[in-house]
Design a protein with these regions (language model features):
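Bacterial N-terminal signal peptides that target proteins for export
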Residues: 1-11
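A mid-sequence, solvent-exposed acidic-amphipathic segment
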Residues: 192-240
Length: 295
């Protein structure tokens, strides 16, 4: 990651922490007081932030509202024809204003590893550290024409730098910047989300960042639409555009999902995910399964 981007990431994270310090008055904090409407904290993305499965939303993790601190943890498994992807992590939401998150991603190359020359069953690993700040608006309440808007940063660090560089990546770590707008139209039971992401990640960062040929940051889009059939059950679809810095035919992502709140604190998500071509192996479509516990 270039020095200007490192500086921007540091400044962005600092601003989020300053906002946290301004809001965090110990005498007013309700620890783990879960007062949000069920499902309105979203689920956990594969990168650890709150949102959908593959798209970040403006939501803040945990079930705490403006006077509390909440926490959530997730485990996600994606089963594809040639790969296996697992993510687990934790997120903290502070006063429905600031979110801090961490996720570890493990990407099993199975037989593809041998074909690519990195070894049968070689697993790519990545750490993702995230921070998000709600700027204005409310997901549920207020003017229906004013969404909840948040900015975020996700610093990603591949633990397989040699592999990333071997496929042509310029670096083994990088930072994504997001701007999200999300609104739940409660009277119609419809949720809509749009996210702009500035990124140089290859396959979410698992194959490094940028390219040795000079390709770097580009602006990508993430969108989600969901319908809430009941207080506890929602179905929807997501779409996420991807850069192709390495020239390996990296495709956009999409999924169709269903999420069910088994209890106020446990949400299960199942989806059909189409991740397209990954490292030249096409038609990577399969099951996305996730469990989230939130307080």
């Amino acid at each position: 990651m270039t020095l200007p981007m490192r500086t921007a990431a540091t400044i962005g994270t600092g601003l989020l922490l300053m906002a946290f310090a301004q809001d965090a008055r110990a005498e007013d904090i309700d620890w783990l007081a879960g007062d949000k409407l069920v499902l309105t904290n979203g689920v956990s993305t594969i990168e650890g932030a709150s949102g959908g499965g593959i798209a970040s939303w403006s939501t803040i993790a945990g079930r705490a509202t403006d006077s509390g601190i909440g926490i959530s943890g997730h485990v996600t498994i994606v089963e594809l024809p040639d790969y296996g992807w697992q993510s687990h992590g934790v997120s903290i939401g502070v006063m429905n204003r600031v979110e801090l998150s961490y996720a570890r991603q493990n990407f099993d190359t199975r037989d593809v590893g041998a074909a690519l020359g990195i070894g049968q069953g070689y697993t790519l690993n990545q750490d993702v550290f995230g921070a998000k700040l709600r700027l204005f608006g409310d997901l549920v309440y207020g003017d229906p024409l004013v969404p909840q808007v948040s900015v975020g940063v996700q610093h990603k660090r591949s633990l397989d730098g040699a592999v990333a560089r071997a496929v042509g990546a310029a670096d083994d770590e990088g930072t994504d910047f997001t701007l999200s707008a999300t609104k739940l139209f409660l009277a119609h039971s419809v949720l809509v989300n749009a996210t702009a992401r500035l990124t140089e990640a290859n396959q979410n960062g698992l194959l490094g960042f940028g390219s040795a040929a000079g390709k770097g940051y580009s602006l990508q889009f993430e969108g989600s639409v969901a319908y809430q059939f009941s207080r506890r059950f929602v179905v929807g679809a997501e779409f996420r555009t991807k850069p192709d810095n390495l020239g390996l035919g990296e495709d956009d992502w999409l999924d169709v999902f269903a999420a069910y709140a088994v209890t106020d604190n446990l949400t299960l998500t199942a989806a059909y995910a189409d991740l397209g071509s990954i490292a030249t192996f096409e038609n990577q479509r399969g099951a996305f399964l996730s469990a989230q516990v939130a307080f």
